[in-house]
């Protein structure tokens, strides 16, 4: 009897997760009114593939091009995303320069639990900023649950956030008049609550879309 109840609850949970994922997908799809090229960047195992799987709909294919196994592509409405691993040394990362052509926005993902690779994250992030100086950057500090945080407690933990910035070299810069804008969001991409259209992941895409729109209007003046 207990096994049947647990099985039923598991099915209900899976159905709810699927429903909320559909809602989240449609939310992101509705954001970008014009075609926008977005780069999903970060070192390997940061959570890029997990995020792409959360974003894509059943009708969207994610494929691996034959010329390089570290990139993949996805289209979600007007959002055209390239997912790129930025591993290796600085010299190797410079080879990614071509991917930044006609880039409208960047999603940079960090595994906050993988402390031993923060120096690699710092170097990758510095390379990204050196290759693209205009596009808005969303930074997703991912896997905060492994640090005992929710999005709310992470935002309130100023000491931890300051330490993260010191270790990774990543800081908020939200004034477009001062140059390239960067905004940090604290998330657990695998969490069911990450599908919420009011959660930090949704707010991250909404902010990115707003900054892309701002840049487009500024360029048209």
UniProtKB/Swiss-Prot annotation:
Q: Name one GO biological process term.
A: vesicle-mediated transport
| A Pfam family this chain is assigned to | Arf
Q: Which UniProt keywords apply?
A: Cytoplasmic vesicle, Endoplasmic reticulum, ER-Golgi transport, Golgi apparatus, GTP-binding, Hydrolase, Membrane, Nucleotide-binding, Protein transport, Transport
**Superkingdom of the source species:** Eukaryota
Supply the EC number(s).
Answer: 3.6.5.-
Quote a single Gene Ontology cellular component term: Golgi membrane
- Which InterPro entries does the protein's record reference? P-loop_NTPase (IPR027417), Small_GTP-bd (IPR005225), Small_GTPase_ARF/SAR (IPR006689), Small_GTPase_SAR1 (IPR006687)
Principal cellular location given in the protein's record: membrane
Which sites bind GTP? 48-55, 91-94, 151-154
Keyword Nucleotide-binding in the entry? The reply is yes
Show the catalytic activity: GTP + H2O = GDP + phosphate + H(+)
Show the coiled coil region(s).
none
Indicate how the chain sits in the lipid bilayer: Peripheral membrane protein
Gene Ontology MF term list = GTP binding; GTPase activity
Cellular location(s): Cytoplasmic vesicle, COPII-coated vesicle membrane; Endoplasmic reticulum membrane; Golgi apparatus membrane
Q: What does this protein do?
A: Small GTPase component of the coat protein complex II (COPII) which promotes the formation of transport vesicles from the endoplasmic reticulum (ER). The coat has two main functions, the physical deformation of the endoplasmic reticulum membrane into vesicles and the selection of cargo molecules. SAR1 controls the coat assembly in a stepwise manner. Activated SAR1-GTP binds to membranes first and recruits the SEC23/24 complex. These SEC23/24-SAR1 prebudding intermediates are then collected by the SEC13/31 complex as subunits polymerize to form coated transport vesicles.
Q: Which family does it belong to?
A: Belongs to the small GTPase superfamily. SAR1 family.
- Oligomer status and interactors: COPII is composed of at least 5 proteins: the SEC23/24 complex, the SEC13/31 complex and SAR1.
Q: What is this protein called?
A: Small COPII coat GTPase SAR1
Give the species.
Encephalitozoon cuniculi (strain GB-M1) (Microsporidian parasite)
Q: What is the lineage of its organism?
A: Eukaryota, Fungi, Fungi incertae sedis, Microsporidia, Unikaryonidae
């Amino acid at each position: 009897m207990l096994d049947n109840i647990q099985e039923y609850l598991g099915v209900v949970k899976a159905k709810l997760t699927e429903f909320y994922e559909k809602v989240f997908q449609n939310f992101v799809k509705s954001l970008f009114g014009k075609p926008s090229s977005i780069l999903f960047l970060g070192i390997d195992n940061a959570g890029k593939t997990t995020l792409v799987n959360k974003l894509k709909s059943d009708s969207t294919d994610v494929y691996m091009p034959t010329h390089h196994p570290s990139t993949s592509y996805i289209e979600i409405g007007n959002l055209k995303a390239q997912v790129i691993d930025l591993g290796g040394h600085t010299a190797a990362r410079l080879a990614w320069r071509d991917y930044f052509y006609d880039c409208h926005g960047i999603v940079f993902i960090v595994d906050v639990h993988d402390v031993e690779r923060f120096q690699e994250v710092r170097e990758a992030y510095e390379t990204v900023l050196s290759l693209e100086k205009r596009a808005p950057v969303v930074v997703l500090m991912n896997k905060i649950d492994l640090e005992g945080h929710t999005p709310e407690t992470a935002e309130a933990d100023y000491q931890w956030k300051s330490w993260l910035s010191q270790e990774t070299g990543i800081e908020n810069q939200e004034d477009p008049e001062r140059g390239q804008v960067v905004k940090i969001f604290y998330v657990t991409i695998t969490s069911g609550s990450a599908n919420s259209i009011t959660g930090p992941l949704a707010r991250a895409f909404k902010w990115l879309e707003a900054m892309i729109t701002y840049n487009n209007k500024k360029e048209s003046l």
